[in-house]
Structure formats: C-alpha cells, structure tokens
Amino acid sequence: MGSPDSSSGSAQKPPRHQHQHQPPPPRRQGSAPELPPGFRFHPTDEELVVHYLKKKAAKAPLPVTIIAEVDLYKFDPWELPEKATFGEHEWYFFSPRDRKYANGARPNRAATSGYWKATGTDKPILASATGCGREKVGVKKALVFYRGKPPRGLKTNWIMHEYRLTGASAGSTTTSRPPPVTGGSRAPASLRLDDWVLCRIYKKTSKAAAAVGDEQRSMECEDSVEDAVTAYPPYATAGMAGAGAHGSNYVQLLHHHDSHEDNFQLDGLLTEHDVGLSAGAASLGHLAAAARATKQFLAPSSSTPFNWLEASTGGSILPQARNFPGFNRSRNVGSMSLSSTADDMAGAVDVSDGGNAVNAMYLPVQDGTYHQHVILGAPLAPEAIAGAATSGFQHHVQISGVNWNP
C-alpha cells in the first residue's frame, strides 16, 4: 500500500502526451498587423475622421488595429516611425492633447528637443453628401516641427496633420474649457484638452521638385533645333516704324546655332535708320532660305563665326578686292546716293588703299530709283543676297518683281 503523499503526487502530475492550449500572447504595440500582401494604408481625410477617430472617441471597435496610441509630444518626430504600427513614408497615431496652461485652452506643442508650430488655418473635414447637405465632422491642422526653443527654432522637414472632431462628436473627447469653480474653491485643474486626436506624420523631401527641374531642363535641350528661324509676328512689326525707335534692332531675321559647323548669324540687319519697316511684311521663310544659300555661296574659309554685324560696322571681313570683267574701279561711288539711278550705280568693288573701309559693290539692276523699303515678302536670289553682303548693306538693291510702293 503506497503512501498517500506518493499517490496524491502522481494524481496531480498531468500525462506527458496531453498538450496544454494557451492563449496567444497579446500583440505588442508597434508590431505590424496581419495584412494581405500589397496592402497600403492611405485613407482620405474623411475616412480618417469618420471611420477611425470618431469610433475611437466613442470607444467603438475599429476596422483594423493599424493606428498606434502614442503621446506624440513626448518624442521627437524622427523617433516616431519605430513607434508606429504600420507605414513606410507616413505614419498614423492616436495621441492625447494637453493644455499649455491649466486655466487656458491653448494646446501644449512642446516636444523633447523642439516644438510643433501650426501653419495656416484649420481646414474643415466634410462628410459625404447626404440629403441635408455635407456635414462638418472634423478639422485638419498642419504643423511643422522646429528644433530648439521658440521663437528662434530651426525649421525641419517633419510635418504633422492633426485631425480632431467638431460639434457633437467632439463632446466625449474634448474639454475646451477649464474645470468650473465649486464651493468657492477651484477643483484641481486637469491639463487634458483632448482625449484623442489623430495625427499623420511624414517627412517632406525635395525629390519631387528635383524631378520637375530635371524634366524642364530636358525639355529645353530638346527644343534646341538646328537652322532655327526666329521672327516677330506681323502684329509686332506693324508698329516698329515709329520715330522713337532709331538705332534699335527690330527683327532677328535668322539665327543659326550649330556647335559643329560654322556659325552663320544674320542678326540686326534691318534697323529703322537703314530701312523703313512695313506693316505688310510677311513670309520670312524666303529670306531664311536665301540666307542659307548665301552661306554656301560665300563659303568663308575661316573657322571663326561669320557675323554680318561686323560687316555693317566697317570691319574688314573680305579679302583684297579683285578686278571683275565689266566693272570699273575708277568710278567715285562715294558720291552716289539712294536717289541715284541704276545707270549711275552699276559700279564695281573699291577698296581704299587696302584699308578697312569696304565700299559697295553694285549689281546691274533695272532702271528706276532706289527707295528705302524693307526687302521682305518676296523670294530673293542668292546672288542678290551675296551682293548685298559684300557691300556691308550700306545701300540696298532693287530686285525685279518686288513692289516698292505698297
């Protein structure tokens, strides 16, 4: 007969083959919930207030335990991501709010090493449209974190969006006034202002601004086209013949920019001092084509850019003059004027003793007098443009087929 101690001990010992079922350990704060792959938590302002903050204030069950309860003002913003339950670039929290002063209604925005500063005004959060219209269910406030003490804090890129309830929904979570005075003495004042507010924390980056800048610079590079012709519209040239605009360039007829070829620049050819601009000028495409043909006709041997502006200012851009059949170098072309006839101005190239002054080479033209009109609106032959180029554009040539008296 065994001892009672041994029998009682054997009866209390459970069999080895039986397993005790224990409840799972409670989920620790900050651990990620069990969510399906690809799940993203990015609710709208209305969804945050109606489906999360409002239910939290009413102590109703939430759709999913994904928002952690953290007193935000006891931490710096860079410490909060590890306190969150879920999130990658933005994190959500339920947080209480305290008063700054016991007898006031201002919230305390101080944190560990800085403070949160409100920016802008409160944005109302409206519920979806109903039969009675859209109802205001909450407000949203934006805040920026500053390191240091106010008002000389250093601004950071940490942003907070604070959501709080309004109206009847805020009665159970907000105490906007200090405790009343009872029996001639004030009860111990509570610093709690809101039981719960919902906050979204994120760090603003400049990646978006940098991407926009890179795209804009790429578009500018693509807009650089060879043989680009830039001209003012007709309505812009209509009023350029006024007397108050002497000596200024009105039209950039052609700008050819090519880093791999000789630069051919036809800029500032026409000024009001030389010619009178006409409102009926049109179709600069012919002039651009003629200018490009002139480039091939002249074929400058120098590798330096060829600039017509140097020719118009008296710079020596041509080689020493040669005798051409049918031209007389003995004529005094300097005495000729714009009113001379074609017979008087059939002259030749004249270089004064090898100097820098380049006189005009006149082409055989039809009978008639010269008038100051812009050579626009009609196709020009490359030979005509070449003749005008060698003359430095000191005088203008009348071309057949051009209406000089519009």
From Swiss-Prot:
The gene is NAM-1. It comes from Hordeum vulgare subsp. vulgare (Domesticated barley). This is NAC transcription factor NAM-1. The keyword Transcription regulation applies. One of its GO terms (molecular function) is DNA binding. PROSITE patterns: NAC. High grain protein content (GPC) is a desirable trait in breadmaking and pasta wheat varieties because of its positive effects on quality and nutritional value while Low GPC is a desirable trait for barley malt and beer production. One of its GO terms (cellular component) is nucleus. The NAC domain includes a DNA-binding domain and a dimerization domain. It comes from the Eukaryota. It is found in: Nucleus.
